[in-house]
Every structure is written in C-alpha cells, then in structure tokens.
Amino acid sequence: MQPTRSVRPFKVVSDYSPSGDQPTAIAELAGRVNAGEPDVVLLGATGTGKSATAAWLIEKVQRPTLILAHNKTLAAQLATEFRELMPDNAVEYFVSYYDYYQPEAYVPQTDTFIEKDSSVNAEVERLRHSTTNSLLSRRDVVVVSTVSCIYGLGQPEQYMNAMVALQVGMQIDRDTLIRKFVSMQYQRNDVDFSRGNFRVRGDTIEIIPMYEELAIRIEMFGDEIEALYQLHPLTGDVVRKMDSVSVFPGSHYVAETEVMRRAIGTIQQELEERLTVLEREGKLLEAQRLRMRTNFDIEMMQQIGFCSGIENYSRHIDGRDAGEAPHCLLDYFPDDFLVVIDESHVTVPQIGAMFEGDSSRKRTLVEHGFRLPSALDNRPLKWNEFTERVPQTVYMSATPGKYELGMGDGVVEQIIRPTGLIDPAIVVKPTKGQIDDLLEQIRIRVEKDERILVTTLTKKMAEELTDYFAEAGVRVRYLHSDVDTLRRVELLSELRAGVYDVLVGINLLREGLDLPEVSLVAILDADKEGFLRSSTSLIQTIGRAARNVSGEVHMYADVLTDSMKRAIEETDRRREKQVAYNTEHGIDPTPLRKRIADITEILAREGEDTKKMLEGRGGGKRSPTPNLRREGKAAAGANELETIISDLNDQMLQAAGELKFELAARLRDELGDLKRELRQMEKAGHLS
C-alpha cells in the first residue's frame, strides 16, 4: 500500500523578515536546491540566524525536510525553534527513546554476558511514532533528529499495510477489529487505559494510538461503525466527532501473519546452518546456547507475533539479503525530501562512526552463540548507504569540515547578522603574567556589568584558576564534564542573571552556548596545538563573544600557531565584511538581549504553585487515583482532579530530576491545563 499524503504548504510565521545576509543566503540556497545540486554548504557565522534561514529555505523549496543535530539537547532546541517558526506544519522530534540503555554484550575474557537493560521514555517513544505517522500521512513535515534516524526501523510498507482505516458506516466485525488491534501490537487492558492499550465495553472500543495523546472511541451497532470520536483519555470528554480515522501500528516492527510465518521459516533455516558450523568447530556450548535462545524467540513470535529483541531478526522479517542495509527513518520520507545537517563539522563524522562501534559488539555475540549472524544486519547505516538514500543535503556550520567543503560547488556565506553585531576583536597576549592580566580585564568588565568566559586545557587548571580568582574576590564558577547536566543549566542561567561574573571551562564553551551578556572570552594556552586548540575549536570558541556589542577575545600564547593564524584570519575577514556592510547601510550594532529561560526555575515555580493550590483546598496527596471511567460521559470531579494534579506534579519533578526535560516540560503544560480546569470548577461551584 502506497501512502496517500495530504498536501499543505510550508509556511513560516514570524514577526521578523529575513535581514542581514539572510535574504541572499536563502535565495542562493533555494536556487541551488531547485537546480538539483546534491550538496550545498552554508557557512553561517555564530548568531546570524541559521535556523531561521533553514526555515525560510524550506518555505521556498516546499520539501519535506530532515534536520540532523549531533545531540538530543541541540535537537530539542531546534525542534522548539522550528515549531515556533512553522506552527501550521508538522514539526516532529525523533531521537533515541532510551533514557538509559545497556546493550547486550559478551566479554569472553571473563565469560560475562551482559543482558540488555534499558529504560524507555514513553513520551519520546510517542514522538517517534508521531514522526512516522506524520511522514506517511502528510507532506508538510519537518523532522528534527539525531543519528537515531540512521538506525534500523521497521519496513514502511509493512507498517502501512498493518494500518487500519476506519470510517463511519464501515462494515466490520467487532471481534475482527479487536484481533486486528492485537496483531498491530496494541494490548487489551480494560483497567489501565494508557497509550498503546485499548479497552472494550460492549459495542464500544476505545484505543490510544502510540503516537497520540488523545484516545479514539469506536461506537458500533452490530457489524457497522456507527460513530467515531476523539476524546480525552482521562476525563472522557469528547474533543471532536470524526467521519474517518486511520490507526497506525503500536510497533515499528509489526508484520503480517504471512510475513512472520515466512520469517520464522528462514530463521529456522539459518539456525540449522549456524548450528552445523558451531558443532563442526567443536563449539558445543555455543551451539546449545544459540539453540535455546533462538527457539525461545521463535516460539514467542509464533504465539504473539513478537519477541524481546525482535529487531535482531529484522533481516528475515524484511526479506533482505545478508549485508543489505536495514530500513530506517529515511525510508519513510517521500523521494524528494531534503536533509539539513546542523553543526555539520561535528555531525558528519558522527554519522560515519556509528556502524563500526555497533558491529564490533555484535560480532562477539555471534561468535559465542548469543545471536545468529543475521543480527549483524540490525545496524545503523554506513556513510555511503546514508548518502545514497539522501537526494540533496544542506550542510550548516560556522566552521564546515574538509568533507563538506570538498562536496559543494563553493559555499553560501551568511556572515552579516540581523542585529548588526560584528565578530569580536582578537588580541594575542604573551603567557607571562597572563593570570594577572586576565584578572585586571575581568575587573574592568565586571564594573560594566558584563560577563567573562575563560577556557583552559585541563580540569585541574580550571579548578585551580577558579580557586585563585575566588580568593581575589571575583565571583566565579567552573564548568566541566563532571558537573551534572541539571547543574550545568543552572550555572549558565546564573551567569546570565549576574549571580556570578566569570565562568571557567574546558571544552564546554563551544557549539550551542548562547550568552549575549559575555563580552570577553579568554583562551589560555592558545598555542598548544590539538583538538581543543584547532582552528575549528578556536573559531567556535571565539563565536561565544559574538553576541555582545563590545565582544573581545584574548588569546594567551607565546607562539602564533597555524590554527591560531587561520582562526584570526577568518575572524578578521568576517569583521571586515560586517563593518563594511554596517557602514554602507548606516546600521548601529544592536545589543542582543534574550530572555533568560531556565527550565529548573519554571518547574520549581510550577511545583510551588501546585503545592499552594492543594494546601489551600486542604488537600495535599490523597489516596491512589480512583477509576475515572464512567458509564456514558466520563468526568473527573474536583477531588479526583486534585489527586491527579498532585500525582502529575510529583512526576514532573521526578522527570526533571532524572534530566528528562522534554517529558518534564510536557507534564508542566498538562499540569497547567488541569489546574485551570480545577479553578474553573471551583468558580462555577461544581465540587464533588
């Protein structure tokens, strides 16, 4: 079955229009993409609005787009930006749904087998299903993803074939529909009505699809669908009545009965062949282990159509040849999609490195009888397989790597900032007396209420420097990999808010740090060639001072290395162009003042508000959440809502403590809605 995608135009909704270098960059990028160029490079200086440029590019070319980021945090930031810029289009977030993941592994030296252990984030899993649902049902889709998009995923054709399309007036037997939902990996549960489950009450079936927050109610009269509703799963309130709805499977690895029967046959055949090899080599223990594990999985697949670790048999389910690339998220896109790789100097090498790390672990499992050789084909794409599947790519970076620069026919530059801000001036100073000089520079800027970043080469030096500055009366903190993520967010917010003035770090002051209050970046030991002092790293670090009108960078070095020369020459080139543009157009650089948003503060405020509200009603935590289902129209009373609010508040704070920020933010939003509902009920006098 070929997907039928609804067509709606991509549209950017913004109070701002393209400015600075953006109009030229957008026009040139769109021209090259429309001309069919396979690779285009955007060299965009820090703070020039590359994300907005990408959004306007998508609006120009009208293509479904995959945006790749090199970590979950940046992906979440990008997804938020694109949702604000394109509110009428489907902006999806596709990352690994594991909060914790320990893959199965075997250590031959100690004869230790490590079972697969993982903790799945249900909200991120919903967003993954929402992504594939959107890709197969509409064209106006922007997916923000990490390298998770190149890992194996179920075959889109089988996913589509398993989908059930329901329509009012449609003839279908109730039991047939129930069996269909079970085959789609949904579970019947008449008590716990949650995502991935369905429940049956007489001729009414209710299901919460894996990709939805709202439930679907199917009311039947005999073998005919009489009505379809979308409803709130908690309160049972009907959101809207529908004429038709499509329900997609509850797993990306779903397969039809005939496909599964064929797959089991080829798995058994491979098992016999592999057992023969192992026994011939005298590996009797490995042969027995493989026989037991595989036969158990086969029995599970025969009984329920699924087993733990079914992805290791994906080659058989898909009917692929040995060594053939797996299906992944890229296969769910239409043929004419566009890929935008953000911070390409980091993301491109990351994509290329995924395959080897995965295969080395699995080879050990295969050799020792824990998995069949076909498990090796459940893997991420190799770099050449990735490029074969991508029709056109736009690489975005302030410092494009050699690979990107060698691919495109010249780069598209975006150097001029909409704010008129110019790249910081660079001053090279000798290392002798560098600490005293830096201390003097810090005091000058503290008097102006400006902030300072100091980057060192080692953790020890960062700590010692922090202690020295603190003894000298400077308000200072340090930041390195041992500082946990939540504390890192707090430190950056405190720096911007003026709780302290100087932040000392190592390699954490590069991509993705947006600190407009910083006017000085000090780079100690700038002449020590290496990863932390390469031209790319230096340019990225210099960019941290590019969001302030009086931004400066002080490099402490006794020798001018090649990396320093390249970084200084590139920065001077950009400054010259920016100053000339500002002079020609009469632009005065405008200070960039961004609102300081700290998720920890927002969540703490929400939690305090909830506590006061419940105490005000004499509540607090009550008995376990009662069963909210009602015959007819379900509704939650005030007391029940209090309990739910209390539970949700605990879940929100727990999610924040476990660094599940996306989940915490969503719980915060849901909490706000429920509290508004409770206040309205109190105002109206509807108390239970």
Swiss-Prot record:
Localization: Cytoplasm
Q: Where is the UVR domain?
A: 642-677
Give residue numbers for sequence motif Beta-hairpin.
97-120
The GO annotation for biological process reads: nucleotide-excision repair; SOS response
Locate the region Disordered: 607-632
User: Which UniProt keywords are listed?
Assistant: ATP-binding, Cytoplasm, DNA damage, DNA excision, DNA repair, Excision nuclease, Helicase, Hydrolase, Nucleotide-binding, SOS response
Q: Which PROSITE patterns match?
A: HELICASE_ATP_BIND_1, HELICASE_CTER, UVR
Residues in domain Helicase C-terminal? 434-587
Q: Where does ATP bind?
A: G44, A45, T46, G47, T48, G49, K50, S51
**Per its UniProt record, what SMART domains does this chain match?**
DEXDc, HELICc
Give the Pfam families listed for this entry: Helicase_C, ResIII, UVR, UvrB, UvrB_inter
Occurrences of domain Helicase ATP-binding (ranges)? 31-188
Q: Which domain of life is it from?
A: Bacteria
One GO term describing the cellular component: excinuclease repair complex
| GO MF entries | ATP binding; ATP hydrolysis activity; DNA binding; excinuclease ABC activity; helicase activity
Q: Which family does it belong to?
A: Belongs to the UvrB family.
Q: What does this protein do?
A: The UvrABC repair system catalyzes the recognition and processing of DNA lesions. A damage recognition complex composed of 2 UvrA and 2 UvrB subunits scans DNA for abnormalities. Upon binding of the UvrA(2)B(2) complex to a putative damaged site, the DNA wraps around one UvrB monomer. DNA wrap is dependent on ATP binding by UvrB and probably causes local melting of the DNA helix, facilitating insertion of UvrB beta-hairpin between the DNA strands. Then UvrB probes one DNA strand for the presence of a lesion.
Q: Which NCBIfam families match?
A: PRK05298.1 (NF003673), uvrb (TIGR00631)
Q: What is known of its domains?
A: The beta-hairpin motif is involved in DNA binding.
Which PANTHER family does the annotation name? UVRABC SYSTEM PROTEIN B (PTHR24029:SF0)
* Assembly: Forms a heterotetramer with UvrA during the search for lesions. Interacts with UvrC in an incision complex.
Q: What is this protein called?
A: UvrABC system protein B
Q: Which taxonomic lineage does the organism of this UniProt entry have?
A: Bacteria, Bacillati, Actinomycetota, Actinomycetes, Micrococcales
What gene is behind this protein? uvrB
